[in-house]
Amino acid sequence: MKVILKQDVKKLGTAGEVKEVSDGYARNFLIPRGIAVEASKGHMKDLELQRKQEEERQQKLKEEAEELKQKLDNEKVVIYQKTGDEGKLFGSVTNKDVAEELKSKGYTVEKKKIEMEPIKSLGTHKVHVKLHPEVTVDIDVQVSEKK
């Protein structure tokens, strides 16, 4: 019997895949638990529609990420931190600090998308921002002394 998986199933497949399984496995386990539905023509059409919608959504997200990349390309972020005697920072500059500074400039970037090691010295540093799995941008972060 062919079924469409609604969830990921170990050793069988991932959600949205059409799989051939034994009748008993489908009727007694997968379908009653809501893990799968029978692969009828109606369900197959629904699956195709969902795939198209997901594709369009992903394309839209990628286009938005490309637009944001264009805006961030020449952006320079300046962060002021307290320093010690020899220019050493008290603490460090993290992705949270960079995200907050970008937010204050009108850009919405989640801190988890900013890939960086904590910055512990003054100067200009390159920071990698992953806007989308296929779209990344490097921005300059200048750490200056707070007076």
Curated annotation (Swiss-Prot):
<dbReference type="InterPro" id="IPR000244">
    <property type="entry name" value="Ribosomal_bL9"/>
</dbReference>
<keyword id="KW-0687">Ribonucleoprotein</keyword>
<dbReference type="InterPro" id="IPR009027">
    <property type="entry name" value="Ribosomal_bL9/RNase_H1_N"/>
</dbReference>
<keyword id="KW-0699">rRNA-binding</keyword>
<dbReference type="InterPro" id="IPR020594">
    <property type="entry name" value="Ribosomal_bL9_bac/chp"/>
</dbReference>
<dbReference type="InterPro" id="IPR020070">
    <property type="entry name" value="Ribosomal_bL9_N"/>
</dbReference>
<dbReference type="GO" id="GO:0019843">
    <property type="term" value="F:rRNA binding"/>
</dbReference>
<dbReference type="GO" id="GO:0003735">
    <property type="term" value="F:structural constituent of ribosome"/>
</dbReference>
<keyword id="KW-0694">RNA-binding</keyword>
<dbReference type="GO" id="GO:0006412">
    <property type="term" value="P:translation"/>
</dbReference>
<dbReference type="GO" id="GO:0005840">
    <property type="term" value="C:ribosome"/>
</dbReference>
<dbReference type="InterPro" id="IPR020069">
    <property type="entry name" value="Ribosomal_bL9_C"/>
</dbReference>
<protein>
    <recommendedName>
        <fullName>Large ribosomal subunit protein bL9</fullName>
    </recommendedName>
</protein>
<dbReference type="Pfam" id="PF01281">
    <property type="entry name" value="Ribosomal_L9_N"/>
</dbReference>
<dbReference type="InterPro" id="IPR036791">
    <property type="entry name" value="Ribosomal_bL9_C_sf"/>
</dbReference>
<dbReference type="Pfam" id="PF03948">
    <property type="entry name" value="Ribosomal_L9_C"/>
</dbReference>
<comment type="similarity">
    <text>Belongs to the bacterial ribosomal protein bL9 family.</text>
</comment>
<keyword id="KW-0689">Ribosomal protein</keyword>
<dbReference type="GO" id="GO:1990904">
    <property type="term" value="C:ribonucleoprotein complex"/>
</dbReference>
<comment type="function">
    <text>Binds to the 23S rRNA.</text>
</comment>
<dbReference type="InterPro" id="IPR036935">
    <property type="entry name" value="Ribosomal_bL9_N_sf"/>
</dbReference>
